Amino acid sequence: MLKEFQEFISKGNVMDLAVGVIIGAAFGKIVDSLVNDIIMPIIGAIFGGLDFNNYFVGLSSAVNATSLADARKQGAVLAYGSFITVALNFVILAFIIFLMVKAVNNLRKRLEREKPAAAAPPPADIALLTQIRDLLARK
């Protein structure tokens, strides 16, 4: 049973999937940093220096805090700023993955075009004439 498991794990598809998941997780952190540390501060500066992560609406009258963390302690909040940030992360990640898939597909198409096409077999009459010629040449 252990040997079967080892064979299963060592197959190319499983290893490729594992590498893809690990790289995907690391890439997700890069996109999070890009959005949180570069894009959102620029957008915040354009809209008055505000941090989108602190945009929220209190869902009860008891919520009167100015920061999201304090507001969550006071009661239920609708944290739409955090949602905007996460949605932007998703859009950027989806676009980058789209570009990567498109590049791989273009590379595959280019490699298929560069492969020489297999020579079509000659028509039956040409093959027969070639055989006759070869037989006559041997005599």
Curated annotation (Swiss-Prot):
Function of the protein: Channel that opens in response to stretch forces in the membrane lipid bilayer. May participate in the regulation of osmotic pressure changes within the cell.
Gene Ontology MF terms: mechanosensitive monoatomic ion channel activity
Keyword ATP-binding carried by entry: no
Alphabetical keyword list: Cell inner membrane, Cell membrane, Ion channel, Ion transport, Membrane, Transmembrane, Transmembrane helix, Transport
Transmembrane segments: 8-28, 30-50, 81-101
Protein name: Large-conductance mechanosensitive channel 1
Membrane topology: Multi-pass membrane protein
InterPro entries documented for this protein: Mechanosensitive_channel_CS, MS_channel, MSC/AndL, MscL_channel
GO CC annotations, alphabetized: plasma membrane
Subunit structure: Homopentamer.
Family per record: Belongs to the MscL family.
Species annotation: Mesorhizobium japonicum (strain LMG 29417 / CECT 9101 / MAFF 303099)
Compartment list: Cell inner membrane
Origin superkingdom: Bacteria
NCBIfam families for this protein: mscL (TIGR00220), PRK00567.1-4 (NF001843), PRK13952.1 (NF010557)
Cell inner membrane found in the keyword field: yes
